[in-house]
C-alpha cells in the first residue's frame, strides 16, 4: 500500500444517520420510518427531504418531551400508543422502522424491546424492526447500514446461485445494472434494500454480494454470517471503477472474460467521450475531500485517474482497510488519506493549501465559499444517481459545474476592456 494513512480525532462536522431516511423511505414506499427523538430531529428530516408534513410522507417523529427526558413518564407506553395510532391511520404500512436518535440513546430507551413487543401484538400484520440513526458515534450514511443490518436477520435462506447488490440505488440505475449483468451472463440478480419491504431477497451459501456503497460494513459482516460471499472490488463510481466492480462479479461466476469485454467495452468508450469535456475543466485542478460520506476514497480514485485532478488530501470518517483495499491500491503513491476528523485542523490545512475545489458538508461550504474557495456538497453525491459506467459523465459534471460557474462569475465581474477602434480624438 503506497498511500500515506493518517488518523486524527477531535471536533467533527457531519450530519447524523437520520438523514439516510430521506433516500430509504423513497426506496421502500410500503415502509414507514418512525424516529424517536427531539424536535430538532423532526426539523432535520423534514428539511432534508423537502416534504411538507401535511403531505403525509412515509416518515415521522415521536417527539420525546421534557417529561420523557426527565424520566417522569413511561416512554415505552407512549411509544406503543404512537405506533398503534400510526398503523391505524396508515394501514398500507407493511414495515415499521423504529429509529433511535441521540436523545433516545441518552435516556437508554430500549427500541429493540419496543419492536419485539409490537411484533407480538401485531402478529405478522406489520413487521417492526429497529436501528439507530444517532450521530453520536457515526456519520450520516451509516444510517443506511443500520437499517439494512436490521433487515438481514429477516432475509429468507436459499442455496440458489445468485448475485445480491447491497445498497440503495436509483431505480433506473439498478435496472440498468441488472440488465448489464444479464447480458454478461448473470441472470439471477436481486437487491437489498428491495423496492418493497415485504419482498426481501433470500441469502445463503450460493449468494455473491457486491456492495454498491462503501459504508455498509456491518451489513456486509452480517451477510457473511449468513453464508454469503462478499466480494472486495472498487466501487461502481466512474467508468473504471464500475467496470472493475462488474468484472469482479463475472469472475466469481466464472464467466468468460471475452464475453464481459464485448458488453462493457462499448460502454466504457461512450463514457470516456462523455467525460472528455469535464476532464478539460478538471485536469490539473487540486481537490481536498473532507470526511463526511465515506464515498471519499472511490471519488478520489475517480477524480484522479479519470479526470486528472490532483489529490491534496482525502479524508474519510472511518476506514475499513479490508473493504477499501482495492480503492487504496489505485490511489497515487504518497496520497494523504486522513481517517477521522478534527475539523479545525482540517480547515487550517485547506486554507494553507488553497485547493481549487473542496468536497465538504453544507455547514462548511458557505464559510469556505466566502473565503474564495470553491466547494461541492458531499451530501449531493449521495442523493444523485452516480453509479455505473453510464453515469460517469454525470458524476464528473457534479465536480466541473462549480468550477465552471466560478469561471463564469469571474468573467462577468471582470469583462475584457473594449479598445477604442476610432483613432479620432473624442470630444466632449
UniProtKB/Swiss-Prot annotation:
Gene3D superfamilies: Nitrogenase molybdenum iron protein domain
Keyword terms: 4Fe-4S, ATP-binding, Chlorophyll biosynthesis, Iron, Iron-sulfur, Metal-binding, Nucleotide-binding, Oxidoreductase, Photosynthesis
Pfam family, one: Oxidored_nitro
Protein name per the record: Light-independent protochlorophyllide reductase subunit N
The organism's taxonomic lineage, starting at the top: Bacteria, Bacillati, Cyanobacteriota, Cyanophyceae, Synechococcales
Record NCBIfam families: DPOR_bchN, PRK02842.1
GO BP annotation list: light-independent chlorophyll biosynthetic process; photosynthesis, dark reaction
Cofactor note text: Binds 1 [4Fe-4S] cluster per heterodimer. The cluster is bound at the heterodimer interface by residues from both subunits.
Protein family membership: Belongs to the BchN/ChlN family.
Cofactor: [4Fe-4S] cluster
Intrachain disulfide bonds: none
Molecular function (Gene Ontology), one example: metal ion binding
Organism: Synechococcus sp. (strain CC9311)
Enzyme Commission designation: 1.3.7.7
Pathways involved: Porphyrin-containing compound metabolism; chlorophyll biosynthesis (light-independent)
Reaction catalysis annotation: chlorophyllide a + oxidized 2[4Fe-4S]-[ferredoxin] + 2 ADP + 2 phosphate = protochlorophyllide a + reduced 2[4Fe-4S]-[ferredoxin] + 2 ATP + 2 H2O
PANTHER family (UniProt xref): LIGHT-INDEPENDENT PROTOCHLOROPHYLLIDE REDUCTASE SUBUNIT N (PTHR39429:SF3)
Binding-site residues, [4Fe-4S] cluster: 16, 41, 102
Protein role: Component of the dark-operative protochlorophyllide reductase (DPOR) that uses Mg-ATP and reduced ferredoxin to reduce ring D of protochlorophyllide (Pchlide) to form chlorophyllide a (Chlide). This reaction is light-independent. The NB-protein (ChlN-ChlB) is the catalytic component of the complex.
Oligomer status and interactors: Protochlorophyllide reductase is composed of three subunits; ChlL, ChlN and ChlB. Forms a heterotetramer of two ChlB and two ChlN subunits.
First-tier enzyme category under EC: oxidoreductase
Amino acid at each position: 500500500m503506497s498511500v500515506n494513512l493518517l488518523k486524527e480525532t477531535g471536533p467533527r462536522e457531519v450530519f447524523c444517520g437520520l438523514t439516510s431516511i430521506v433516500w430509504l423511505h423513497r426506496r421502500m414506499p410500503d415502509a414507514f420510518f418512525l424516529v424517536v427523538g427531539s424536535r430538532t430531529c423532526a426539523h432535520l428530516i423534514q428539511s432534508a427531504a423537502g416534504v411538507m408534513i401535511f403531505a403525509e410522507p412515509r416518515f415521522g417523529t415521536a417527539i420525546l418531551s421534557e417529561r420523557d427526558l426527565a424520566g417522569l413518564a413511561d416512554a415505552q407506553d407512549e411509544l406503543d400508543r404512537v405506533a398503534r395510532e400510526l398503523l391505524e391511520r396508515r394501514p398500507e404500512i407493511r414495515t415499521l422502522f423504529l429509529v433511535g436518535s441521540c436523545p433516545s440513546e441518552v435516556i437508554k430507551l430500549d427500541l429493540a424491546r419496543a419492536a419485539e413487543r409490537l411484533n407480538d401484538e401485531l402478529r405478522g400484520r406489520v413487521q417492526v424492526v429497529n436501528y439507530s440513526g444517532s450521530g453520536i458515534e457515526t456519520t450520516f450514511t451509516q444510517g443506511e447500514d443500520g437499517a439494512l443490518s436490521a433487515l438481514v436477520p429477516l432475509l429468507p435462506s436459499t442455496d440458489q446461485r445468485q448475485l445480491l447488490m447491497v445498497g440503495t440505488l436509483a431505480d433506473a440505475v439498478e435496472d440498468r445494472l441488472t440488465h448489464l449483468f444479464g447480458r454478461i451472463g448473470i441472470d439471477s440478480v436481486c437487491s437489498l434494500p428491495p423496492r418493497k419491504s415485504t419482498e426481501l431477497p433470500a441469502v445463503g451459501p450460493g449468494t455473491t454480494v457486491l456492495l454498491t456503497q462503501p459504508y455498509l460494513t456491518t451489513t456486509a459482516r452480517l451477510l457473511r454470517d449468513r453464508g454469503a460471499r462478499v466480494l472486495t472490488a472498487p466501487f461502481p463510481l466512474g467508468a473504471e471503477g464500475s467496470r472493475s466492480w462488474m468484472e469482479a462479479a463475472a469472475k466469481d461466476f466464472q464467466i468468460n472474460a471475452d464475453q464481459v469485454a464485448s458488453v462493457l467495452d462499448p460502454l466504457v468508450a461512450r463514457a470516456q467521450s462523455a467525460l472528455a469535456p469535464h476532464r478539460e475543466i478538471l485536469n490539473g485542478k487540486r481537490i481536498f475531500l473532507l470526511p463526511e460520506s465515506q464515498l471519499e476514497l472511490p471519488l478520489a480514485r475517480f477524480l484522479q485517474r479519470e479526470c486528472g485532478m490532483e489529490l491534496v488530501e482525502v479524508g474519510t470518517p472511518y476506514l475499513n482497510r479490508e473493504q477499501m483495499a482495492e480503492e487504496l491500491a489505485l490511489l497515487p503513491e504518497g496520497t494523504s488519506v486522513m481517517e477521522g476528523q478534527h475539523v479545525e485542523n482540517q480547515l487550517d490545512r485547506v486554507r494553507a493549501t488553497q485547493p481549487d475545489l473542496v468536497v465538504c458538508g453544507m455547514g462548511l461550504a458557505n464559510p469556505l465559499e466566502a473565503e474564495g474557495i470553491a466547494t461541492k456538497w458531499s451530501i449531493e453525491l449521495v442523493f444523485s444517481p452516480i453509479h455505473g459506467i453510464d453515469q460517469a459523465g454525470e458524476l464528473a459534471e457534479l465536480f466541473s459545474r462549480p468550477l465552471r460557474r466560478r469561471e463564469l462569475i469571474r468573467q462577468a465581474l471582470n469583462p475584457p476592456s473594449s479598445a477604442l477602434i476610432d483613432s479620432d480624438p473624442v470630444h466632449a
